Amino acid sequence: MRVRVAVLKVVIVILLLVLCVEFVFYLFVVPATSFAKVEFSGNVTISPEYLMKAAGLTGKEKWMSLDGFTISERLASVPLLAQVEVLKKFPDTMHVHVVERVAIALGFVHVQGRAMPVQIDKTGTVFSVGTAPLDTVLPVVSGLEFRNPRVGLRVHDQLVPLFVQLDNLSKRNPLLLGEISEISIEQKRHGGYDLALYLVRAPIRVRMDKNLSEEKLRYVILLVDALREWQTQRRIKELDVRGGTAVYR
């Protein structure tokens, strides 16, 4: 009986030692010696290789040596990214979730005498110069001024609500947004701005205030459709809805 108890104690001690060794191995050895596994999510158009390079990673870093805050800061400085979240998972994984910027409108700037498109997101941030999305038709916003156009620039603070409204339209009623060909920003003499809309369906310039809501746009399109019937009898060039009543010229 005593022999069995002694053997059982030895077995228990051995098991405890094995567990301690495994605990130490996973707690200290694996994080300090294993190459970190970097996982990305949320990237649709950006490759993992691009993100690795932007984060300053080579794929040979040890998990223990990774600084999540530094990596997050590096990726947050990439103009193509709107949000970045870095999470280190014990013992050897780092997960990086990104949210890419999405173009809500196009602008045009002049670089060395050439007109080039710039992509602008809902925050009014320019994140691409010289390229336009091939699979999406976006409204053009004219009247923007950039002295030195480059990625990372933002439009003036007073214009940001316009891009927020465009983003809301794209989510709630993209077909309605697709009716807009161009939005021209017209600065007022004493501050603020009005808008001039050019619609796809008719060559009529629509002047309105900066409230580009879904209801207002529906109202404008309804008026334009009514005026189209008069186009054969009258040459209407402009519709003004800024004063609460519609005036055509």
Descriptions of predicted regions:
Residues E39-E73:
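Short extracytoplasmic
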